[in-house]
């Protein structure tokens, strides 16, 4: 499914300084298809062989909801253990795609470990996350139901997709959804700050009430 992603240097590039950069991190057990998803998104190409222990970084410039976006995507190795390098990209990342394979129940169970790893570093449950069940084309090998994925996404309060990197099903949707989550949470944070900085009308009215009474008594 192609929703219009274009590589860097396409007609979608925006004037210098206007494109917002989004730092996205791919997480998940080895062999679930993180690299295949990323490469399909970036170059519309399915890698026939890839070393799951290699970490790669990719960049692409696209438009999402008619807004330009520079995506800086880190495709991590599949180990969930805590390391100094992982601590750095957990802090720097603005949004996370946590992947499992619908053909591998163990990879589904490891999703919680990656979610806990995000919380361990960032100390907040409000970090933008998208949950992905990959390899949806391998229905005959399915070990994790779609309902289980939906239930876990509800627990995480995040978007959920079942994808096929092999056939490019819903690949663009995943990355677009994560950028939308980042934008939404940024807007919520700005509104919260604006609300906090404004004096509450009820407090202001209460402070003014004695002066109003004095004025009324004088007249």
Swiss-Prot record:
It is an enzyme of class 3 (hydrolase). Alternates between an inactive form bound to GDP and an active form bound to GTP. Changing residue 53 to S: Loss of interaction with AFDN, RLF and RALGDS. Changing residue 82 to V: Found in patients with features of Noonan syndrome; likely pathogenic. Disulfide bonds: none annotated. Its EC number is 3.6.5.2. Its main location: membrane. GO terms for molecular function: calmodulin binding; G protein activity; GDP binding; GTP binding; GTPase activity. Keywords: Cell membrane, Disease variant, GTP-binding, Hydrolase, Membrane, Nucleotide-binding. The keyword Metal-binding does not apply. GO terms for cellular component: plasma membrane. Residues 197-219 have a biased composition (Basic residues). Expressed in many tissues. SUPFAM superfamilies: P-loop containing nucleoside triphosphate hydrolases. Changing residue 95 to A: In NS8; results in increased ELK1 transcriptional activation. GTP binds at residues 28-35, 75-79, 134-137. Residues 193-219 are annotated as: Disordered. Belongs to the small GTPase superfamily. Ras family. Plays a crucial role in coupling NGF stimulation to the activation of both EPHB2 and MAPK14 signaling pathways and in NGF-dependent neuronal differentiation. Involved in ELK1 transactivation through the Ras-MAPK signaling cascade that mediates a wide variety of cellular functions, including cell proliferation, survival, and differentiation. It is linked to Noonan syndrome 8: A form of Noonan syndrome, a disease characterized by short stature, facial dysmorphic features such as hypertelorism, a downward eyeslant and low-set posteriorly rotated ears, and a high incidence of congenital heart defects and hypertrophic cardiomyopathy. Other features can include a short neck with webbing or redundancy of skin, deafness, motor delay, variable intellectual deficits, multiple skeletal defects, cryptorchidism, and bleeding diathesis. This is GTP-binding protein Rit1. It comes from Homo sapiens (Human). The gene is RIT1.
């Amino acid at each position: 499914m192609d929703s219009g992603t274009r590589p860097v240097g396409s007609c979608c590039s925006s004037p210098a300084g206007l494109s917002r950069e989004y730092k996205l991190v791919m997480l998940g057990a080895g062999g679930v298809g993180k690299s295949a998803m990323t490469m399909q998104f970036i170059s519309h190409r399915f890698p026939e062989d890839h070393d799951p222990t290699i970490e790669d970084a990719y960049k692409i410039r696209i438009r999402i909801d008619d807004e330009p976006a520079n995506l800086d995507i880190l495709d991590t190795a599949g180990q969930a253990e805590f390391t100094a390098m992982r601590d750095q990209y957990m802090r720097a990342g603005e949004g996370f795609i946590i992947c499992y394979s619908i053909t591998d129940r163990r990879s589904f169970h490891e999703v919680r470990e990656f979610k806990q790893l995000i919380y361990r570093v960032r100390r907040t449950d409000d970090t933008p996350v998208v949950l992905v069940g990959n390899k949806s084309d391998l229905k005959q090998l399915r070990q994790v139901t779609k309902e289980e994925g939906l239930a876990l996404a509800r627990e995480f309060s995040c978007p959920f997709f079942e994808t096929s990197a092999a056939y490019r099903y819903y690949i663009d949707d995943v990355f677009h959804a994560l950028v939308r989550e980042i934008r939404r949470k940024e807007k919520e944070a700005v509104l919260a700050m604006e609300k906090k900085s404004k004096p509450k009308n009820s407090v202001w009215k209460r402070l003014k009430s004695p002066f109003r009474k004095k004025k009324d008594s004088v007249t």
